[in-house]
């Protein structure tokens, strides 16, 4: 009884269900739907958009004799008109001098003004009746109007089906007013779309819908509905846009109408009105506007290929052309794509392979797989570019993974490509699992392939390959195998297994894992290389270390090999200075004098670790870190450069470049460190890019290769990764409740070229390592709202070209040797642009463009003070020679 009273008091006076029309009355209303597009800032009058208005007649045709709440109503649009939402447009208005009938076209206007029938039961839409074969865009506008007549007069939450789909709605009733709040995120409707699942590279979208009804005499006097759709890129919030869509319905008058049609069955009534009426879904239907005068795929490619020449890849225009062509490829057929691939020359072909693979459609995948021959040694570069594009796929599917598994089981012309295929399979497993695809059959097969391969592998190369795949996949099931290889494997294998464990999230680093890492660091069972021990320590310190774990690590400083002492001391100081999660525990332990004393904290050496901010805002941060470990003889053992991007607490490992060297002590007649006496001469570079581990490259391997490089006194830069990457890829097709179709897209791409070199000169007693990273970045966002006869759009974007170089110089002509580390950033041009437009299907349009440019000065990133002092010595100005002599 109390529930009944509460429900009644919260409802509109005298009614507990939906709208009710009076018999024999024709309701005459005015209706308008308008849409505004902008970046979400400033006055709506600065927006682009349009308004569609009309008169509307509503009449009750039939009411069930069994109850007032079962009604059939007829809705008719009349006198349709188009106008600007921006009254200041004046002479620039696209509608000026044009009749609405000319713009909408005769057949569309006739369809729009044909009546629709709405069968309402208890205020909810039972069926929507219209004529077959009407244009979907026009039908949607009528669906948008008809959906406004669905409502209830009592408060409560329910599910309704209207033009937006099957949605959760909440009603709030107050005397003569009812407010309907639709949870747009809950709407079930089939629409194309995809997004980048990673928070850092993804977008945040918001959607709200509020409709207010003013009721008199059981019918609406006025309806105001507002739907807002907003979108912004998480890490660059200037890439943002908003759609405001409004509907207004207002009662002007009522007049006498035809009498109700008698009968018990609504179907008979509809047939009597017009037998051509048919029930169709009230949910909005998909339509595509035809592109007039658009180039073919081949014509588009010919117009942009000059921007994708190798010499032009450092420019943002290359990325712009790449992104635009991907959009076109997504509508292309396999035969069209293959034709272009087969006709292209070898200079531009790698960039074309990047684009075709990044399109991520069934046709583009079939085309590229038909084109590439993995048994050939002549197309290795193209095969590698295909695999890298797969690794960075924004929304990979199971078919792509299955294709790579199939290729892996076949034969290869290059063993490097075979390794890359397995490594990229690991990356795809990770991405699919992050997108709730871990139980897909293809993913399960890939997991078995990686774990089974690692368990059975006997050759060193195969073990490395499967470990690198696991480093990308990060399968929890692989942790026991990683522990085995870390603790019992030989040096390089042990180190790779440890760095693979290092990539796992905190919940997976269990007490068992940390016990193993402690045994390795403290060498309880066997002697390990410095690189393995320091990685084990990093895993402990990163994953909620206990008091005793931190204390034991601090107590070990002073008992370690000289350069490892300095390295671990730098790691601890960096933790304290940069406020990592372990900082609190380290400070607590340092209160003990046994751990915190001068002897322990005054160890000398050249190894170092430093972390700093590239940029920091209230919601995001970008950090860089550089740690370098030397052997006791002064030769580089490992350098590790990392750049992370954070959105709140979510990290993206943007770049990691690791240079490793071993077995070089014989060159300067030095004694190897403990546990490293039998290592082969080797130097190589390993890169991780946007959370994907790539196949490492080798500078030299073995003594003879080393001698040839050394006698040349230099090493040519080796390409680590080069290509065009699609990193940000978001596309939404939206059904606005007004009936208009909207699209929201964000794309981000970059052209990247990372090279590494190691120079070693016995003559000058000097070694240098260089890592150079050049990128061109373009991010674009686009929003359109289309009615099929008029379209409004907003495009925003940002672009830049940047370079970052890391140089490590070691002079070992004296002891202690001199070490200088440099991280240099070049001047960075930064450009932002905004385009707004309105366009008729007849071709007439309005366009507004804005552009802003700035230059961010280059700089050398600060490292620790000791490094700055050392660099002054290494690069001290040479004194001018005095001119003394015989002449």
From Swiss-Prot:
Signal peptide stretch: 1-11
A biological process from GO: plasma lipoprotein particle assembly
Chemical reaction(s) catalysed: a 1,2-diacyl-sn-glycero-3-phosphocholine(in) = a 1,2-diacyl-sn-glycero-3-phosphocholine(out); a 1,2-diacyl-sn-glycero-3-phosphoethanolamine(in) = a 1,2-diacyl-sn-glycero-3-phosphoethanolamine(out); a cholesterol ester(in) = a cholesterol ester(out); a triacyl-sn-glycerol(in) = a triacyl-sn-glycerol(out)
A GO cellular component annotation in the UniProt record: endoplasmic reticulum
Subcellular location: Endoplasmic reticulum; Golgi apparatus
Gene3D superfamilies: Lipovitellin, beta-sheet shell regions, chain A, Vitellinogen, superhelical
Alphabetical list of InterPro entries matching this protein: Lipid_transp_b-sht_shell, Lipovitellin_superhlx_dom, MTP_lip-bd, MTTP, Vitellinogen_b-sht_N, Vitellogenin_N
GO molecular function, one term: cholesterol transfer activity
Record keywords: Disulfide bond, Endoplasmic reticulum, Golgi apparatus, Lipid transport, Lipid-binding, Signal, Transport
Stated role: Catalyzes the transport of triglyceride, cholesteryl ester, and phospholipid between phospholipid surfaces. Required for the assembly and secretion of plasma lipoproteins that contain apolipoprotein B. May be involved in regulating cholesteryl ester biosynthesis in cells that produce lipoproteins.
Subunit structure of this chain's protein: Heterodimer; heterodimerizes with the protein disulfide isomerase (P4HB/PDI). Interacts with APOB. Interacts with PRAP1.
Protein name (Swiss-Prot/TrEMBL): Microsomal triglyceride transfer protein large subunit
């Amino acid at each position: 009884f109390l529930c009944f009273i509460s429900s009644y008091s919260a409802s509109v006076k005298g009614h507990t269900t939906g709208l009710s029309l009076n018999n024999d009355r024709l309701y005459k209303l005015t209706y308008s739907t308008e849409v505004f597009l902008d970046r979400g800032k400033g006055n709506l009058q600065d927006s682009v958009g349009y308004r569609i208005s009309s008169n509307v007649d509503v009449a009750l045709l039939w009411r069930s004799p069994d109850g007032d709440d079962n009604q059939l109503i007829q809705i008719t649009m009349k006198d349709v008109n188009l106008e600007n939402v921006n009254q200041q447009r004046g002479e620039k208005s696209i509608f000026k001098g044009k009749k609405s009938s000319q713009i909408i076209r005769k057949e569309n206007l006739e369809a729009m003004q044909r009546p629709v029938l709405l069968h309402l039961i208890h205020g909810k839409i039972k069926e929507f009746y219209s004529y077959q074969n009407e244009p979907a865009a026009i039908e949607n506008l009528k669906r948008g109007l008809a959906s406004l007549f669905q409502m209830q007069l009592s408060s409560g939450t329910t599910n309704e089906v209207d033009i937006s789909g099957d949605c959760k709605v909440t009603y709030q009733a107050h005397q003569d007013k009812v407010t309907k709040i639709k949870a747009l995120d809950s709407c079930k409707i089939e629409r194309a779309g995809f997004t980048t699942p990673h928070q850092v590279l993804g977008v945040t979208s918001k959607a709200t819908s509020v409709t207010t009804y003013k009721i008199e005499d059981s019918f609406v006097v006025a309806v105001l509905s507002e739907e807002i759709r907003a979108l912004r890129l998480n890490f660059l919030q200037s890439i943002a846009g908003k759609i405001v869509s409004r509907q207004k319905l207002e009662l002007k008058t009522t007049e006498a109408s035809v009498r109700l049609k008698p009968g018990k069955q609504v179907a008979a009534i509809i047939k009597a009105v017009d037998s051509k009426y048919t029930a169709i879904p009230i949910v909005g239907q998909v339509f595509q506007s035809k592109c007039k005068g658009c180039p073919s795929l081949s014509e588009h490619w010919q117009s942009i290929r000059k921007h994708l020449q190798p010499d032009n890849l450092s420019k943002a225009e290359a990325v712009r052309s790449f992104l635009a062509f991907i959009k076109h490829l997504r509508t292309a057929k396999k035969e069209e794509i293959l034709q272009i691939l087969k006709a292209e020359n070898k200079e531009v072909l790698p960039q074309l392979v990047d684009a075709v693979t990044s399109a991520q459609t069934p046709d583009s995948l079939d085309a590229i797989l038909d084109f590439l021959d993995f048994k050939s040694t002549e197309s290795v570069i193209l095969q590698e570019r295909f695999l890298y594009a797969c690794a960075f796929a924004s929304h990979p599917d199971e078919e792509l993974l299955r294709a790579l598994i199939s290729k892996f089981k076949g034969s290869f012309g290059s063993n490097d490509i075979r390794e890359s295929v397995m490594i990229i399979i690991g990356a795809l497993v990770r991405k699919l699992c992050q997108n709730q695809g871990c139980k897909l059959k293809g993913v399960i097969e890939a997991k078995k392939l990686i774990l089974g391969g690692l368990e059975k592998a006997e050759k060193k190369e195969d073990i490395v390959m499967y470990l690198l795949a696991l480093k990308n996949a990060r399968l929890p099931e692989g942790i026991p195998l990683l522990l085995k290889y870390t603790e019992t494997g030989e040096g390089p294998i042990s180190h790779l297994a440890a760095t693979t464990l290092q990539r796992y999230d905190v919940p997976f680093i269990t007490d068992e894992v940390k016990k193993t890492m402690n045994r390795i660091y403290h060498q309880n069972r066997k002697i390990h290389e410095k690189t393995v021990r320091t990685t084990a320590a990093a895993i402990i310190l990163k994953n909620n270390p206990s008091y005793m774990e931190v204390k034991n690590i601090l107590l070990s400083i002073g008992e370690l090999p000289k350069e490892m002492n300095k390295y671990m001391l730098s790691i601890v100081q960096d933790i304290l200075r940069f406020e990592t999660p372990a900082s609190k525990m380290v400070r607590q332990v340092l209160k003990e004098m046994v751990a915190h004393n001068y002897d322990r904290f005054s160890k000398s050496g050249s190894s170092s670790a430093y972390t700093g901010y590239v940029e920091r805002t209230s919601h995001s941060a970008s950090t860089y870190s550089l740690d370098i470990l030397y052997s006791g003889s002064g030769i580089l053992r490992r350098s590790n450069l990392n750049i992370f991007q954070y959105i709140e607490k979510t990290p993206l490992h943007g770049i990691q470049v690791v240079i490793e060297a071993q077995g070089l002590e014989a060159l300067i007649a030095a004694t190897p460190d403990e546990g490293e006496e039998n290592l082969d001469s080797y130097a190589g570079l390993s890169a991780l890019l946007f959370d994907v581990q790539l196949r490492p490259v080798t500078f030299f391997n073995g003594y003879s290769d080393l001698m040839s490089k050394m006698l040349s006194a230099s090493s040519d830069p080796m390409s680590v990764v080069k290509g065009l990457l699609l990193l940000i890829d978001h596309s939404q097709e939206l059904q606005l409740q007004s009936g208009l179709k909207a699209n929201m897209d964000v794309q981000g791409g970059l052209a990247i070229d990372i090279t590494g070199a190691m120079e070693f000169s016995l003559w000058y007693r000097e070694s240098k390592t260089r890592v150079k990273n050049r990128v061109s970045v373009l991010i674009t966002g686009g929003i359109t709202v289309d009615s099929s006869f008029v379209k409004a759009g907003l495009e925003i974007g940002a672009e830049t070209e940047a370079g970052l170089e890391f140089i490590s110089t070691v002079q070992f002509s004296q002891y202690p040797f001199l070490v200088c580390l440099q991280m240099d950033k070049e001047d960075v041009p930064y450009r932002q642009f905004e385009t707004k437009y309105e366009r008729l299907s007849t071709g007439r349009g309005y366009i507004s463009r804005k552009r802003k440019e700035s230059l961010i000065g280059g700089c050398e990133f600060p490292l620790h003070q000791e490094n700055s002092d050392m660099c002054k010595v290494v690069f001290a100005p040479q004194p001018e020679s005095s001119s003394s002599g015989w002449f």
